[in-house]
């Protein structure tokens, strides 16, 4: 079982390892049980899809493949790539940037 993931949907991230290294995108989906994320427009794979109905087109389509959460890093608007810390204010837990302290 994987630990708690600090990456959430709609986070801006940069890929730090693999064939898409250095590219930035937004997290579309988080796969908590597999410790993976799907980043919009990155890590595209070709998949053969079967025709489902008369109107639906079958054939080869490109879809986004999951990336290991350890291969992406959250981007802070102020200082760029950063790690995430948690801060409790007024009983609410918020994610903050470790470099500049801004809320993410």
Swiss-Prot record:
GO biological process: translation
Cited InterPro entries: KOW, Rib_uL2_dom2, Ribosomal_uL24, Ribosomal_uL24_CS, Ribosomal_uL24_KOW, Translation_prot_SH3-like_sf
GO molecular function: rRNA binding; structural constituent of ribosome
One cellular component (GO) term of this entry: ribonucleoprotein complex
Keyword annotations from UniProtKB, A to Z: Ribonucleoprotein, Ribosomal protein, RNA-binding, rRNA-binding
Role this protein plays: One of two assembly initiator proteins, it binds directly to the 5'-end of the 23S rRNA, where it nucleates assembly of the 50S subunit.
Assembly with partners or alone: Part of the 50S ribosomal subunit.
UniProt cross-references to NCBIfam families, sorted A to Z: rplX_bact
Family according to the record: Belongs to the universal ribosomal protein uL24 family.
Protein name as catalogued: Large ribosomal subunit protein uL24
Organism whose genome encodes this protein: Treponema denticola (strain ATCC 35405 / DSM 14222 / CIP 103919 / JCM 8153 / KCTC 15104)
